[in-house]
Every structure is written in C-alpha cells, then in structure tokens.
A protein has these predicted regions:
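Soluble, non-membrane globular domain cores that form compact, hydrophobic packing
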Residues: 1-168
C-alpha cells in the first residue's frame, strides 16, 4: 500500500522535519515499503530486510535540489543516480527533476547496499522529468543559495506567538 502525505498532513509522517520540507515548496510524498524477496510484511511494516521508498515532489527542480542539498553529506562519494546521489549506508538519497527521493533499508549489509542501489536506479528511471540542473545552480552555489534562502523565507509559516502578559 502506497501512503501519500501532503502539506496538510506531512507532520504525521515526519513531524520534526515537515516544516523544513514545506519551506521548499513541498507538494506531496509517496511512501512505499517493499518486503525482501521471499519475505512477508509483518506487524508494523516490512520484515527487517525490506526496502522503503520515499518520493518527495516539490514545485520545481530548484526546490527539490534545495532539500537534497540540505541532506547531502559532502564527505560521501557521489553516485550516478538521478542528477546527484549519495549513500549513507542505510539510505540512498537522490534528486531528479522536481523529486527528492530516499530509498532505504533497515539493515546495513553489502548485499542490501547493491539491491538498494539497483532499486534507486530503477526509481530514477521512472521519473519522466529529464532532470537538468536548474539555471540557478548552474550560475553557481552562491546564487542558488540566495534563491533558496529567499524561497524558504517566503514559504515559512509564522508560528503563533503568545500575547505578552501584562501584570501590574
């Protein structure tokens, strides 16, 4: 079963990070668990050797790049999946077009790392967007950072502030 979350209910899935995703013109995320070959989904999700795919759609490639750039660990080598990708052992993160995608496993094992990489490549191939770098990124990281910062400030929702107490 594919679960879909939108801006209105994203906090139900990623409570602490929802605001950050929304600030990058988040539209929706589709979440799907896959059981390992020969395995069955158990209570509370797939068996421990399964895969989970999260495909976050944003309003533009620049916004998808923005959230990906926040997740990107520069110490990890790039992978040739989508526009850019990396693996932290438990997940492969990539962005392509308007999508930031995370493919994850529940155990860090060499055979799962290869399966995860193959699965992520298949997911990337299914994204019809050609995945060209946004012009803001091609102009340089400084320009992209300025545009992303402006977009993030524009999208952030003000938090309610308690009225000051007047004691006298």
């Amino acid at each position: 079963e594919t679960l879909v979350y939108t801006e209105e209910n994203l906090w139900e899935y990623i409570d602490g990070a929802a605001e950050n995703f929304i600030s990058f013109d988040f539209k929706s995320v589709a979440v799907q668990d896959y059981a390992a070959a020969g395995g069955a989904a158990g209570a509370g999700g797939v068996e421990r050797a399964g895969l989970k795919v999260e495909a976050y759609e944003h309003a533009s490639p620049l916004m998808a790049y923005g959230i990906y750039a926040q997740m990107r660990n520069a110490d990890l080598p790039p992978l040739e999946i989508g526009n850019d990708a990396f693996s932290d052992g438990y997940s492969i993160h990539f962005w392509k077009g308007r999508y930031y995608v995370r493919v994850g496993v529940y155990e860090e094992r060499p055979e799962l790392a290869e399966a995860m990489k193959s699965f992520a490549a298949v997911v990337a191939s299914k994204i019809d967007d050609p995945g060209a770098l946004p012009a803001e990124i091609e102009r340089g990281p400084g320009h992209a950072h300025q545009v992303l910062a402006h977009q993030g400030q524009r999208r952030r929702r003000p938090r309610p502030v308690a009225a000051p107490s007047h004691r006298g």
